[in-house]
Amino acid sequence: ATFDVVNQCTFTVWAGASPGGGKQLDQGQTWTITVAPGSTKARIWGRTGCNFDANGQGKCQTGDCNGLLQCQGYGSPPNTLAEFSLNQPNNLDYVDISLVDGFNIPMDFSPAAAGVCKDIRCATDITAQCPAELQAPGGCNNPCTVYKTNEYCCTNGQGTCGPTALSKFFKDRCPDAYSYPQDDPTSLFTCPAGTNYKVVFCPNLDA
């Protein structure tokens, strides 16, 4: 499957992808990634406030992946995530936007061909409204990152946690996105296997 990663932000975003690596995207630029069929627990995110040297080493304010331009693993919270597992049983792809690792950039995650399946959006500037206890440089932390308790992180397994006032802060602003780890019923979507996708940083914001 191909993923077109598009930066519509007025600022530079350093895209990260696992699998895929990373790339600097100035406003209006696109990075096309080819992801192998059957890839699971894959994700794409944006990094902000980065400085890299000629060897691709440095640091980002949000989404940093061990100081590397070419990510080899996941990024550090807070970062808005497009997550996907491809070619799963019944010829389905599973796709979602997750705020379980917090929020740094508004995002739209959609099939490249409109209408094939759900256009998943988190197009609100959550950082600007972030509760004081969740504020982080350049973003807004999920309460799981801050408090690391089962109440917020669901570490004790299925059915041991539910929505909280702090998870609802995210859900109210981005109803399509995971606000806590067991938010599956309203946040996990399927597309036909073989679908190609588009991930947009800073889509036109919802009012």
UniProtKB/Swiss-Prot annotation:
The enzyme's E.C. designation: 3.2.1.-
Subcellular location: Secreted
Protein name: Thaumatin-like protein 1
Miscellaneous comment in the UniProt entry for this protein: On the 2D-gel the determined pI of this protein is: 4.4.
Assembly with partners or alone: Monomer.
Gene of this entry: TLP1
GO biological process terms on file: defense response
Cited function: Acidic thaumatin-like protein. Exhibits weak beta-1,3-glucanase activity with laminarin as substrate.
Keywords attached to this entry: Allergen, Disulfide bond, Glycosidase, Hydrolase, Pathogenesis-related protein, Plant defense, Secreted
Family matches, as InterPro entries: Osmotin/thaumatin-like_sf, Thaumatin, Thaumatin_CS
Disulfide bonds: 9-202, 50-60, 65-71, 117-191, 122-174, 130-140, 144-153, 154-161
UniProt PTM: Not glycosylated.
GO molecular function, one term: hydrolase activity, acting on glycosyl bonds
Organism phylogeny: Eukaryota, Viridiplantae, Streptophyta, Embryophyta, Tracheophyta
Listed GO CC annotations: extracellular region
Keyword Hydrolase: yes
Recorded superkingdom: Eukaryota
Alphabetized SMART domains for the sequence: THN
Family the entry assigns: Belongs to the thaumatin family.
